[in-house]
Amino acid sequence: MNIIVVGLSHKTAPVDFREKLSIPKVRIGEAIRELCNYPHIEEVAILSTCNRLEIYLLTSDTYQGIREATQFLADSSDLSLPELRQHLFILLHQDAVMHLMRVTAGLDSLIIGEGQILSQVKQCYQLGQQYQGIGPVLNNIFKQAISAGKRVRTETQISTGAVSISSAAVELAQIKKQDLRTANITILGAGKMSRLLVQHLLSKRVKDINIVNRSVERAKLLVDQFKEANINIYNLSELKTILQNSDIVFTGTSSQEPIITPELINDCDNLPSELMLFDIAVPRNVDPNVSQFDNIKVFNVDDLKVVVSQNQQTRRKMAKAAEILLEEELSAFNIWWGSLEAIPTINKLREKAEIIRVKELEKAISRLGNEFVSDHQEIVESLTRGIVNKILHDPMVQLRAQQDIEIRGRALKILQTLFNLDTIKNGMSPTL
C-alpha cells in the first residue's frame, strides 16, 4: 500500500490550465466513484479550489495508481497525457502526507497563512467520507492534517494579518484605481468570496456596492450581514445594464462557464471609458477574449501575485516555525503508519489466544458441571478474557510503539515463530 497525491496548483500551472481540471462540489461524488472503480485505487479524497486540484490516494500498486489517477484527469478534462504531465506533480508516502499538512496549514497557498484553505480541506474530508472514498488510512491522515493546520494557526502567528484572495483583489484594484471611494463597484456572486470582497471594500471606505447574483434571495442574505452599507441587489438578467454603469467589477461565482463574454460586451451600448474586471473565480467568470476590448482591463487570480509578494516576506519567517511543528506531526504519523505493519501479527496472536481460551474454558465447564456454570459462567468468562488481555497488552503496545523498522520487523518474525502464527488462517488453527 502507498499514499499518493497527484495534482497541480498555482505553482505548477496557470489559471487557464487549472480551470480545465477544476471539479465543482456537485461533481465530487461522481469523481470519487469513478476513481474508486479503478482496480488499484483503494481510497480517494479530492481537494479542488481556485488554486489547486489534488487527488489523494491509497493504492495497492504505486505505479498503477498514479497511471489510473492521471488517466482519470485526462479523461475528465479532454487534455492529453503529455499536456497534463507538464503541469502535474506527484508525491509519495511521507512527502504526500507532509504536503497535505503544509496545504492545510496555509504554507503552500498563494497567500501564506490564508485561512480559507483549512475549511476547504475540511470540506474535502467531509465529502470523501460522504461518498465513501475515504477509508481508515486517509481518515487518519486528514484528521491529523486538519489538527496540524489548527495547531500551526494557534501556536504561530502565520495567520495574523494574512491577506485572502478577496482582499488581495481589492488591494490590486486600489493600486490600479487609487481611490476606490469614487468608483462605481459591482460584485458578481453572493458566496463566501463575495462576502469577503464586501468586507474589504468597506474597510477602504467604499460606500456604494452593487451585488449581481442569479439568486436574489441569496444576495439578500449577504447584504443582511452588512446593514450599515449601501448595497444594491440585482438579478443576473440585469448584468448588461449594471456593466454599463460600473468602473470596477469583481467576479467570484462557481459557474463552470464564463458569464462575462465578448458577446455580452458587444451588446452593451455605453460602457465607461475604462472598465476593470477582477476575476477571482476558477473556472474563470470572465472569458479571456474580453481583454481584447480596448477600454477593458481583465485581471485574474494569477495577477494577484504582485500584491501578494509585498505581504510574503515577513510571513516566510513565521512559516519556518510552522514547518518545525509540521515535522513533529509527521513523526507522529510515521509512528502510526509503522504500527500498521504489526496489526496482522497482533490480530493472529489475539485470534490464537482466543481459540485457546475458548477451548480451555469448555474443558473447565465440562468438569465443573451445569449447576456451577449457570451460576458463575459470566464471572469465569470475564476472568479468562481478563487474563488473556493482560498477557497480550504489553507486547502489543511495544510492537505498535517501536519506531525502529528493523527492530520491529525482527520482533514480528520472532513472535510469529514462537507462537506458530503462520498456522492461523481465517480464524482456524489446524494444530489445535
Curated annotation (Swiss-Prot):
According to the UniProt record, one GO cellular component term is: cyanelle
| Primary location group | plastid
Q: Which residues bind NADP(+)?
A: G189, A190, G191, K192, M193, S194
Instruction: Give site residues, Important for activity.
Output: H99
Entry keyword set: Chlorophyll biosynthesis, Cyanelle, NADP, Oxidoreductase, Plastid, Porphyrin biosynthesis
Tell me which residues bind substrate: T49, C50, N51, R52, S109, E114, G115, Q116, Q120
Reaction catalyzed: (S)-4-amino-5-oxopentanoate + tRNA(Glu) + NADP(+) = L-glutamyl-tRNA(Glu) + NADPH + H(+)
Pathway in which this enzyme or protein is active: Porphyrin-containing compound metabolism; protoporphyrin-IX biosynthesis; 5-aminolevulinate from L-glutamyl-tRNA(Glu): step 1/2; Porphyrin-containing compound metabolism; chlorophyll biosynthesis
- State where the protein is found: Plastid, Cyanelle
Q: GO molecular function of the protein, one example?
A: glutamyl-tRNA reductase activity
> Do you know which InterPro entries this protein is assigned to?
4pyrrol_synth_GluRdtase, 4pyrrol_synth_GluRdtase_dimer, 4pyrrol_synth_GluRdtase_N, GluRdtase_CS, GluRdtase_dimer_dom_sf, GluRdtase_N_sf, NAD(P)-bd_dom_sf, Shikm_DH/Glu-tRNA_Rdtase
GO BP terms: namely: chlorophyll biosynthetic process; protoporphyrinogen IX biosynthetic process
| Active site residues according to the UniProt entry | C50
**Assigned EC number:** 1.2.1.70
Which PROSITE patterns does its entry note? Answer: GLUTR (PS00747)
Q: Pfam families annotated for this entry?
A: GlutR_dimer, GlutR_N, Shikimate_DH
What function does this protein fulfil?
Catalyzes the NADPH-dependent reduction of glutamyl-tRNA(Glu) to glutamate 1-semialdehyde (GSA).
Domain-level remarks:
Possesses an unusual extended V-shaped dimeric structure with each monomer consisting of three distinct domains arranged along a curved 'spinal' alpha-helix. The N-terminal catalytic domain specifically recognizes the glutamate moiety of the substrate. The second domain is the NADPH-binding domain, and the third C-terminal domain is responsible for dimerization.
Q: Can you tell me which family this protein belongs to? A: Belongs to the glutamyl-tRNA reductase family.
* Extra remark beyond the main annotation: During catalysis, the active site Cys acts as a nucleophile attacking the alpha-carbonyl group of tRNA-bound glutamate with the formation of a thioester intermediate between enzyme and glutamate, and the concomitant release of tRNA(Glu). The thioester intermediate is finally reduced by direct hydride transfer from NADPH, to form the product GSA.
Summarize the subunit comment. Homodimer.
How is this protein named in the record?
Glutamyl-tRNA reductase
